[in-house]
């Protein structure tokens, strides 16, 4: 467990420089191929084929409070707040009672295809997705740093660590209903790979000189073959409990014997209404569904309060300059006081909902120049560890029918203000897009973090640094190949190709000779053939 938490914490630090809660800036980006993932009623200008490996990479992540409240520079070295050179007063003045919230949501597109069939737009794609999130109360950090000097009572409730990974295969369809309404849906088949959820809804610590009294309520659920969850017999409790310190990745994993840890399904639904040519109102609900996970391990806290005897030399602080050593030291101490009773529920299924989200937006195009628009977007995401809400305004400009840019500003409930930008370049065959939901203004140099994490098997792959303040962003990048005729213009409206026709010369009246004894029959007037507007 120490290894998992240490690596996860380092990974969150390493990816935060390019990470957010989704792709909000792209919602109104003209020509964006994967708009149907934000709202299934959005239709692409043309059909497309996504190149495997580079078609779409999305990483969403963030944290609050900022790393500047947790990482400190002492004697030229970057250390955590647990380092003994960081004073208790220095740490508490920066944290200011803030709870910790972190999230990481990578989304890798494996295959994607979009095509038009008549007036309907369809897509099929396969993706690898993951959700990792954690939430810890301020009292946990106060205990780790200040110990019994701060208080005799600590409330560690609402501690949550969640991680899940799954494969998604989805089919979507979007079509017009009348002249100004579009609706769409997206049906998903899900195959679970790994799931772990540790939820301590209640945990109160009453610290005595010789013994600590702990009252906790929570559980742990694990599904999948990628993690090993050992148990051990606790003589004091007289029960078999989880060996929390030794939870680790499976070392003898056999890919040939691998089976999904669960199956499930989900649906996206969305609609776009255009009451006027310059105004659109849209809304979508995404990821309504879940996965039935096969239980690998399940454990619960004891029904009664229990006591914990700390070691005489127990200390959360350390003089080590290694961030991983500091995290490991704290994790080891916390794990030793957590008792989770093992339950015999192997093989039983538990249905777990996906983190779902809802988007509502309004887009207003300039009446004098419809290549410029102002978009407003509200987002709610119901996450496993905490919920996320944001309001974003974007200014979008299609300089040409093949080149679009977008800039945005957002405010969210994580107390972050973010500024994002995106570009979409789609001349003919190629469609290339790149964007961020937030651009950091202050960073911690990468070299400082690399030195502190030197004992981990990876380096931070970013040249500048990682965000210093509280951060919530996202990066998306991809290349697709366009194919077929154009069915929508840059604004997502029906594409009408104008066909010029030459006027036929007027016909002079002709004298008709009718044989004697026959009547003249009425006939349809001659009309000049025209070429109607054609949708492409």
Question: Which sequence ranges carry the predicted segments?
Answer:
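N-terminal secretory signal peptides that target proteins for export/translocation
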Residues: 1-2
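Bacterial N-terminal signal peptides
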Residues: 7-16
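Subset of outer-membrane beta-barrel
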Residues: 21-536
